[in-house]
């Protein structure tokens, strides 16, 4: 039966009329009389909410997101963090290298990874990785007396790179100073066979500190120390990427990440330590032996030990709430999420409903999550614009139906608000990967992390995001007060998309800047293109049964 279904999809999809729309046949013109034709210019800009507590989940809301189990190992939110943002990937790798190169005796490196490869962190100056390669940098950390712990997903796509990284990292000799060592473990503690261990964090911490002003550093976002990722804002570095072994499946990479110095970094560290120390061991099945994913013997690691506050600091002006996803259907998160956690999902819903003026989404996917669609439709009448940048879905077989779920997310918004809502991608001939997982609302709220815009990231796969609100404010061209860091992040992303300068975009209202996307999409010198999304006749064959496998929504009820 499945063979017949796949053949049927293939036959329809390959036909010249593959863009045939059932809606066109049976009615339902996308520009019907019920559409709101406003382009946002007729809507008065409103002062956005500025208080972090207006955006963040309350302690009770976090508890509710965990099936009624309080979250005791992470703060509700933290203040006084110093955040550095990276809108282009080489910025991230330069910063990671500098931080790792400064580690000293007793320091700890905790890396949570979707994939790890022995790539150079600075391929533009060190293409062979002789000085900045992941293996060399980790060896230097251990030689100086630092320890390294890596939790890496059993990633089949990057298997050969992961195995090589595992073998190299686990073979690093113990430190001659204090016997510190490096250990990489493959982690398969997931709800289903198609799940991903998706958290992407890096923590650099002291073994202990009695300084009441000292705090660790953490990186949170969409990037791994892996192939394909290193790139610049111009996405024209094929020669460097090829010469250094960076290139894998793409010719460039878009992403987002932040560096946190402050108490929020402790939350990121605590998340890692709890996973590492779980009594349920990873990679214990015969599959792991067959695929060479077996792990070495290892020990529990101590929690980080700082005398400074777990909730406040004076290092910067940014307030941060760490949000997560752990499936409520997986029984082996008992130490840290016995009923799962979907605080990330709940935080996104709350933030969208707070929108006063605009929402900017840049994500690997933009597929149907019914609750997120409902929240967007709730605020669309009163905001000026919704701008989305995402990858196209061009094949019914890739991602098991994501082409349909993209249409289902886009169509209701586009039909009702054809001028307020615009969706873009990158030009196909550039062969770029949009891997970003970023939401910016009103230039006040920035969400960045590992979670994609799909159901599995919201409810099933292990994910970790940082929700950021900046107490340092600036006046926008519209005359309202906004957060300095979220606005700066957004402008730098718009530079990447449109090719316009920072100063030009800084002087524009959001509507004016958003209009530059349409200009850039028709300009061959930019990376941007319109994302064309159509209904296809074969969509009815992509059933909810398929969706429950490729994009599960894990929900549980407790009494």
Segments the model singles out, each with a brief description of its role:
Residues 9-26:
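N-terminal signal peptide
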Residues 22-27, 42, 268, 276-302, ...:
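Accessory carbohydrate-binding/adhesion or oligomerization-edge regions at the termini
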Residues 1-8:
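Classical eukaryotic N-terminal signal peptides for Sec-dependent ER targeting/secretion
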Residues 11, 231, 470-472:
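Extended rod-forming repeat segments used as scaffolds/tethers
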Residues 13, 61-62, 236, 282, ...:
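A generic structural signal for solvent-exposed, polar alpha-helical segments
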Residues 25-26, 33-108, 115-354, 362, ...:
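HKD-type phospholipase D/PLD-like phosphodiesterase module
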Residues 223, 251-252, 370-373, 393-394, ...:
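Long, C-terminal catalytic modules of enzymes
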Residues 344-361, 365-372, 377-384, 558:
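Long hydrophobic segments that form regular secondary structure
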């Amino acid at each position: 039966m499945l063979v017949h279904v796949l053949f049927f999809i293939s036959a329809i999809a390959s036909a010249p009329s593959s863009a045939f729309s059932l809606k066109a046949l049976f009615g339902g013109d996308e520009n019907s009389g019920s559409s709101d034709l406003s382009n946002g210019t007729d809507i008065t800009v409103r002062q956005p909410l500025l208080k972090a507590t207006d955006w963040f989940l309350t302690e009770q809301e976090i508890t509710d997101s965990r099936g009624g189990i309080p979250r005791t190992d992470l703060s509700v939110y933290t203040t006084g963090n110093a955040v550095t943002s990276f809108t282009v990937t080489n910025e991230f790798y330069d910063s990671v290298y500098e931080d790792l190169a400064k580690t000293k005796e007793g320091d700890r490196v905790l890396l949570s990874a979707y994939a790890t490869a022995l790539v150079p962190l600075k391929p533009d100056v060190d293409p062979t990785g002789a000085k900045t390669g992941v293996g060399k940098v980790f060896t230097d950390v251990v030689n100086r007396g630092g320890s390294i712990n890596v939790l890496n997903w059993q990633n089949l796509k990057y298997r050969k790179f992961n195995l090589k990284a595992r073998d190299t990292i686990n073979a690093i000799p113990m430190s001659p100073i204090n016997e510190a060592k490096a250990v990489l473990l493959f982690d398969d503690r997931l709800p289903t066979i198609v799940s991903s261990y998706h958290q992407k964090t890096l923590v650099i911490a002291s073994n202990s500190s009695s300084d009441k002003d000292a705090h660790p550093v953490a990186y949170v976002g969409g990037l791994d120390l892996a192939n394909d990722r290193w790139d610049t804002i111009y996405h024209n570095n094929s020669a460097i990427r090829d010469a250094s072994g960076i290139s894998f499946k793409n010719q460039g990479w878009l992403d987002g990440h932040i560096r946190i110095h402050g108490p929020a970094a402790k939350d990121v560290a605590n998340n890692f330590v709890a996973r590492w120390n779980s009594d349920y061991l990873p990679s214990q099945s015969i599959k792991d032996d067959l695929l060479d994913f077996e792990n070495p013997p290892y020990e529990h690691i101590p929690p980080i030990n700082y005398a400074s506050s777990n909730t406040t600091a004076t290092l910067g002006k940014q307030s941060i709430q760490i949000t997560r996803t752990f499936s409520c259907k997986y029984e082996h998160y008992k130490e840290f999420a016995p009923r799962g956690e979907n605080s990330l999902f709940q935080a996104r819903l709350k933030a969208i409903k707070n929108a006063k003026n605009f929402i900017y989404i840049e994500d690997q996917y933009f597929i149907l999550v019914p609750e997120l669609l409902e929240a967007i439709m709730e605020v669309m009448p009163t905001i000026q614009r919704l701008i989305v940048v995402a990858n196209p879905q061009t094949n019914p077989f890739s991602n098991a139906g994501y082409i349909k779920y993209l249409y289902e997310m886009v169509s209701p918004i586009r039909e009702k608000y054809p001028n307020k809502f615009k969706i873009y991608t990158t030009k196909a001939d550039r062969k770029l990967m949009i891997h970003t997982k970023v939401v910016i609302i009103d230039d006040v709220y920035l969400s960045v992390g590992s979670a994609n815009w799909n159901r599995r990231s919201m409810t099933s796969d292990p994910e970790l995001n940082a929700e950021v609100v900046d107490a340092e404010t600036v006046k926008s061209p519209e005359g309202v007060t906004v957060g300095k860091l979220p606005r700066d992040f957004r402008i730098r992303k718009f530079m990447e998309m449109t090719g316009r300068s920072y100063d030009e975009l800084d002087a524009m209202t959001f509507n004016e800047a958003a209009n530059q996307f349409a200009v850039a999409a028709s300009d061959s010198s930019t990376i941007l293109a319109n994302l064309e999304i159509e209904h296809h006749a074969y969509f009815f064959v992509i059933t909810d049964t398929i969706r429950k496998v490729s994009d599960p929504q894990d929900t549980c009820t407790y009494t």
